[in-house]
């Protein structure tokens, strides 16, 4: 069990100015007036994930989305190493993705950074050590991030990934197990909403 309060975490994205907390439960994204916005964890988003990889069954979001300009830097929240990285090419998938591994008092924790730029993975390598606050990636554009508006999908996992992928949305029938396996990213990001 992780004692989250014993650890100090660096910001993952420097959100400049005010931001909007999105309500994506209606299944569509409406552009906010702020430069940055946040999509919620444990949010049902029926109708939003309509590409073949979701099969209409998966629409419970188990990460946090931080939306902002293309090229926005993404930083490591604590000391760790790169566990996996790669490109998921299917429409609606992550596009470029990096997964980092961290030790929190003897418990392994993985963090997925999804919807990244091509540049983010060009010189990446598994086992690369990362420091708190180190820029490890950048928000990707539509053509490289799975076809989404520019944002970071940030997700924690207590389950070791076998590749550069984790389910960012699950079936509502899997909610109980998914929330155990993929803890609330606000434990690291702080109270975004």
Where are the regions that the model predicts?
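Short, glycine/small-residue-enriched coil/turn segments at secondary-structure junctions
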Residues: 56-90
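Polar/charged, compositionally biased leader and regulatory segments
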Residues: 1-69, 175-193
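Small beta-strand-rich domains/subdomains or short beta-sheet motifs embedded
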Residues: 67, 74-75, 113, 128-130
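Zn2+-dependent peptidoglycan hydrolase active-site motif and core
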Residues: 76-120
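Acidic, glycine-rich catalytic/binding loops that coordinate metals and/or anionic ligands
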Residues: 1-15, 122-144, 148-193
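Short alpha-helix capping/helix-loop boundary micro-motifs
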Residues: 67-69, 119-124
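Terminal peptide-recognition signature
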Residues: 66, 80, 100, 133, ...
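Histidine-centered active-site/metal-ligand motif
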Residues: 61, 102, 115, 151-153
